[in-house]
């Protein structure tokens, strides 16, 4: 048996792991048993990306949700009757917390009586076997897989199997849902389930789908990774009319959906995890007029605030584009700061639908050039600190100034950044040290002096030889000229000798 807890922890993002641990902690404090269920477990065993964290507790999930809210989570919607809470957890993770329950039908097709139950009863009352799997997060059974309907086998066979013959009768919206799961996962519908599906269509059960249930499926499609495949499957089975007759007549805007899906891939490549529900909803309804779009959302059970946000999304995005291409955004750093705060779904919408080259070039620069520079900014801070600048307000300002210069192409090398940092911080370069001349050793000094004396004697001897050769060439013996000091004594000696000879003759 695989170690599902190890698989889960190795596949979770750090933010998702923190959420899971916090929910475990709160559940234990309240005395609730807690389980990961539904899509989270299904995506885990199929190897798909874990988009949401779905928790089921044997207790009231509202208490946990409101405690999480204190730590930064946001409650998106809460159904008190079903005890189901949609949550945007801290760390920007989506998910839900539900109470374990059993739906008791007096007869097929009637409204169920809700009873709070154990996890096993909750799994057995679900729509399809691939959604009826759970992993325990409780201390005594942590990592234990619960699969009472043999959903793992159906996943291995790549089949979507309903759990009861009354599945579509009790909840006709499952006609849309079974096609959505099959299209999303590339699965086929199990044989008996297909027979029940065909029988339900023959009985026109699709016409009994409530607007609220249809709206729920419309929201789900907007969050799908392959929305076009799901919508086409609905159209092939004439089920799009159950969502809305006008949409069925005019058809979804598949070209707009395709553009948005391409943008979604680009954002994933750039390191984002975009939630594109609003722009995708507009893309699905793209062929409808504004009034028709509003009518579809109203009939689909969208709350007024939710509907206004969706219908006003395009206008808000175009206003943002107008500001982005304005004069105030000429500097790259100003455009970066603006785009950094702009909601990602608006950026995606502009990438898919804008025809303004100036806006698109700035968005591409933001995603592919400016953000990597921003992510490398801690290196600049480290370099400034190494120069001796203490951290503080001025320190942060200098780092931001360097970032602004880097967006213009300056400060690419470490040497260039150091010059910029010194100039901005006022830290001067240390004075260069002069190299002292090395004194030779005493023995070496004497050797040099002796060599110098030898050279002088050699030169003097060579000069004398040259002088002798010159005199020999003239026929005169070469005689060294006496020094002036010695001339007088020689002359005096000659006079004395002459005087002696003179006396002798006399």
Residue ranges: model-predicted function:
Residues 1-506:
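Catalytic cores of the polymerase beta-like nucleotidyltransferase superfamily
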């Amino acid at each position: 048996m695989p170690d599902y807890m190890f698989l889960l922890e190795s596949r979770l993002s750090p933010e998702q792991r923190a959420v899971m641990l916090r929910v475990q902690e709160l559940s234990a404090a309240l005395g609730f048993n807690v389980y990961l269920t539904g899509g989270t477990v299904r995506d885990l065993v199929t190897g798909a990306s874990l988009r949401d964290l779905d928790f089921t507790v044997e207790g009231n999930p509202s208490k946990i949700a409101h405690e999480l809210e204190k730590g930064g989570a946001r409650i998106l919607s809460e159904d008190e009757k079903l005890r189901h809470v949609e949550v945007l957890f801290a760390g920007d993770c989506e998910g839900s917390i539900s109470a374990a329950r059993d739906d008791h039908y007096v007869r097929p097709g009637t409204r169920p009586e809700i009873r709070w139950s154990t996890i096993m009863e909750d799994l057995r009352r679900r729509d399809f076997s691939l959604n009826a799997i759970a992993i325990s997060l409780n201390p005594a059974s942590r990592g234990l897989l619960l699969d009472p309907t043999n959903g793992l086998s159906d996943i291995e066979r790549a089949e979507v199997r309903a759990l009861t013959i009354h599945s579509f009768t009790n909840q006709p919206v499952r006609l849309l849902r079974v096609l959505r799961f099959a299209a999303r996962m590339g699965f086929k519908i199990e044989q008996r389930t297909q027979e029940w599906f065909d029988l339900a269509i023959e009985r026109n059960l699709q016409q009994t789908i409530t607007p609220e249930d249809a709206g729920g499926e419309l929201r789900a499609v907007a969050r799908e990774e392959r929305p076009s495949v799901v919508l086409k499957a609905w159209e092939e089975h004439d089920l799009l009319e159950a969502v809305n007759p006008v949409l069925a007549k005019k058809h979804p805007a598949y070209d707009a959906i395709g553009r948005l899906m391409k943008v979604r891939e680009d954002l994933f490549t750039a390191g984002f995890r975009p939630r594109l529900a609003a722009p995708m909803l507009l893309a699905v309804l793209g062929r409808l007029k504004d009034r028709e779009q509003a009518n579809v959302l109203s009939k689909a059970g969208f709350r007024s605030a939710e509907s206004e946000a969706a219908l006003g999304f395009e206008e808000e995005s175009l206003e943002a584009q107008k500001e982005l291409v304005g004069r105030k955004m000429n500097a790259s750093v100003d455009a970066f700061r603006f785009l950094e705060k702009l909601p990602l779904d608006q950026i995606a919408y502009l990438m898919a639908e804008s025809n303004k080259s100036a806006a698109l070039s700035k968005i591409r620069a933001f995603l592919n050039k400016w953000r990597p520079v921003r992510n490398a900014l801690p290196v600049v801070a480290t370099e400034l600190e190494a120069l001796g600048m203490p951290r503080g307000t001025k320190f942060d300002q200098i780092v931001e100034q360097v970032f602004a210069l880097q967006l213009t192409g300056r400060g690419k090398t470490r040497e260039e950044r150091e010059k910029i940092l010194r100039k901005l911080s006022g830290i001067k370069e240390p004075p260069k040290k002069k190299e002292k001349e090395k004194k030779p050793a005493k023995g070496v000094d004497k050797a040099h002096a002796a060599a110098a004396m030898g050279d002088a004697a050699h030169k003097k001897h060579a000069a004398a030889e040259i002088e002798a050769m010159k005199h020999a060439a003239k026929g005169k013996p070469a005689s060294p000229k006496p020094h002036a000091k010695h001339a007088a004594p020689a002359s005096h000696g000659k006079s004395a000798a002459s005087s002696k000879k003179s006396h002798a003759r006399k």
